[in-house]
Amino acid sequence: MKIDPIHQFNIEPLFTIGHIGHQTIAFTNSSLYMLIAVAIISLLMLASGAQLVPGRLQSVAEISYEFVASTIRSTAGSEGMKFFPLIFSLFMFICVSNLIGIIPYTFTISSHLIVTAALALLVFFTVLIYGVAKNGLKFFSIFVPHGVPGYILPLVMFIEILSFFLRPVSHSVRLFANMLAGHIALKVFAGFVAMLGFSLGALGWVGGVLPLALTVALYALEILVAFLQAYVFAILTCIYLNDAIHPGH
């Protein structure tokens, strides 16, 4: 029995939309699950309503709203709430996409670097454009930390500038790598249990009890990671936006 933990990440075309020169434009499984994630979030927001006694959907929507709002206020202040639609959308999209990807035989959008890089670049250019538009040249004071001795200031400035422009890399790779590694580990453990059962029969299934228990534990951990990675992406977005809102702090 062959175990291929990488096959689950393959982007497969579902149907062709058209052609641009020699390049085929196709609707892929990645596109499909992006639409599914957006549809689930939209339905959650629309179905939550505004009842005096909140139901389950409204409770989920309200908890999500308050969680993101409190995260923004604690990291970027009340002025950061103007970015609430962006941060809330990013948090919900990543969280729902991650949770969908945990379901067997589905597709994990955030396990592809091109997707996480697009989200990280959106945050990066939002910070850069807003920071310059709001603060002018004062925005670049974030590259000059207070209290640094003059003789090492050029080195510190170089490090600060480098770290600023590397933010999209760390922001995107963190999410991508965690989701990729977790799903590969889950696939390997589950495949090992199945291989024992099919290869050794009843004896294999008995021997597979421990790996199966580890697979269940790993699956539960992946559910936690799905929420945690969405939170980490959102709070880093808040921290980066705080530089644009309060560049001198």
Curated annotation (Swiss-Prot):
InterPro entries associated with the record: ATP_synth_F0_asu, ATP_synth_F0_asu_AS, ATP_synth_F0_asu_bact/mt, F0_ATP_A_sf
Principal subcellular localisation of the protein: membrane
Bilayer-spanning residue ranges: 33-53, 83-103, 113-133, 139-159, 188-208, 216-236
UniProt entry keywords in alphabetical sequence: ATP synthesis, Cell inner membrane, Cell membrane, CF(0), Hydrogen ion transport, Ion transport, Membrane, Transmembrane, Transmembrane helix, Transport
Claim: Phosphoprotein is one of the keywords in the record: no
MF terms in GO: proton-transporting ATP synthase activity, rotational mechanism
GO biological process: proton motive force-driven ATP synthesis
Membrane topology term: Multi-pass membrane protein
HAMAP family: ATP_synth_a_bact
NCBIfam families in the record: ATP_synt_6_or_A, PRK05815.2-4
Complexes and interactors: F-type ATPases have 2 components, CF(1) - the catalytic core - and CF(0) - the membrane proton channel. CF(1) has five subunits: alpha(3), beta(3), gamma(1), delta(1), epsilon(1). CF(0) has three main subunits: a(1), b(2) and c(9-12). The alpha and beta chains form an alternating ring which encloses part of the gamma chain. CF(1) is attached to CF(0) by a central stalk formed by the gamma and epsilon chains, while a peripheral stalk is formed by the delta and b chains.
Protein name: ATP synthase subunit a
Protein species of origin: Bradyrhizobium diazoefficiens (strain JCM 10833 / BCRC 13528 / IAM 13628 / NBRC 14792 / USDA 110)
